Design a protein with these regions (language model features):
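Conserved active-site tyrosine of GNAT-family acetyltransferases
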Residues: 148, 153
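Conserved hydrophobic beta-strand within the GNAT/NAT acetyltransferase core sheet
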Residues: 104, 135-140
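Acetyl-CoA-dependent GNAT
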Residues: 30-33, 41-112, 123-125, 129, ...
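Conserved N-terminal entry element of GNAT/NAT acetyltransferase domains
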Residues: 11-34, 176-180
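Conserved G/P- and acidic residue-centered "switch" motifs that form tight phosphate/ATP-binding loops
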Residues: 117
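A cross-taxon signal for low-complexity, glycine/charged-rich
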Residues: 2-6, 18
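Residue-level detector of beta-propeller blades
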Residues: 91, 155-157
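C-terminal "cap" of GNAT-fold acetyltransferases
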Residues: 138-145, 157-180
Length: 180
C-alpha cells in the first residue's frame, strides 16, 4: 500500500510518558496536512536547540533552510509515514519513516520535552512496520548518537552533506530488525 494508506490503517496509540516532574499522557498518531505548520516550527526549534558543541549556528541555519515551513512538510506528509506524539493539540515530537527503504528519515522532539520518553515512544511506533530480516537505517545528528545507540542501533559510517557551502556531518546507523 501507499504510505497514505498505511497511515490511515494504523491505530492511534496512547502512551504514558514523563513530562517534567509529572506523568502525562500523549498520543502517537499519524500526521495530517493540518499538522504541517506545527511540525515545521518544532523542527526549527529542535535544530536551533542543539548544542553548539555539535553544530555551529551557521550549520544549524543551513540544516533548517527550506525545511522550516509548512509547505515543505505538507509534501512529506503526503509521501511518507510521519507519526506524531501529541498532547491535546500540541505536538511534542515527530518521526518520519520511509517504509519502502526501511529508513528513518528524521526524529525530532520539542526541546521542552526531550529526555522524557517521547522519542522512544515514536521509534517504538514505527519499528514494527519494518520488514522482517531487513536492516533499518537512519542518518542521525551528532546530538542524537547516544539515543540511537541506546535503542540498539550500530554506527556504520560518517556522512558529509554539502549544504549552502557548508559540510554538515551526520552518521549512518543501522538496526537489524530481527533484534527488535
Amino acid at each position: 500500500p501507499l504510505p497514505q494508506e498505511r497511515e490511515q490503517s494504523t491505530a492511534v496509540s496512547t502512551v504514558s510518558g514523563s513530562l517534567k516532574s509529572s506523568t502525562a499522557t500523549f498520543r502517537i498518531r499519524p500526521a495530517t496536512h493540518n499538522d504541517a505548520a506545527q511540525i515545521a516550527e518544532l523542527f526549527r526549534r529542535a535544530v536551533l536547540h542543539i548544542e553548539a558543541s555539535h553544530y555551529s549556528d551557521s550549520e544549524k541555519a543551513a540544516w533548517i533552510q527550506g525545511a522550516d515551513n509548512a509547505a515543505f512538510w505538507q509534501k512529506r506528509i503526503g509521501r511518507s509515514c510521519i507519526r506524531l506524539a501529541a498532547q491535546n493539540d500540541r505536538i511534542l515530537g515527530f518521526i518520519e519513516y520511509l517504509p519502502e527503504q526501511n529508513h528513518l528519515d528524521c526524529l525530532f522532539t520539542d526541546p521542552v520535552h526531550q529526555q522524557q520518553g517521547v522519542a522512544s515512544a515514536l521509534l517504538s511506533a514505527v519499528l514494527p512496520q519494518a520488514d522482517a530480516d531487513k536492516t533499518v537505517t537512519a542518518d542521525v545528528s551528532a546530538a542524537a548518537l547516544p539515543f540511537f545507540k541506546k535503542q540498539g542501533f550500530i554506527l556504520q559510517h560518517q556522512n558529509q552533506i554539502q549544504r549552502n557551502g557548508l559540510v554538515l556531518i551526520n552518521y549512518r546507523m543501522i538496526l537489524q530488525t530481527d533484534s527488535i
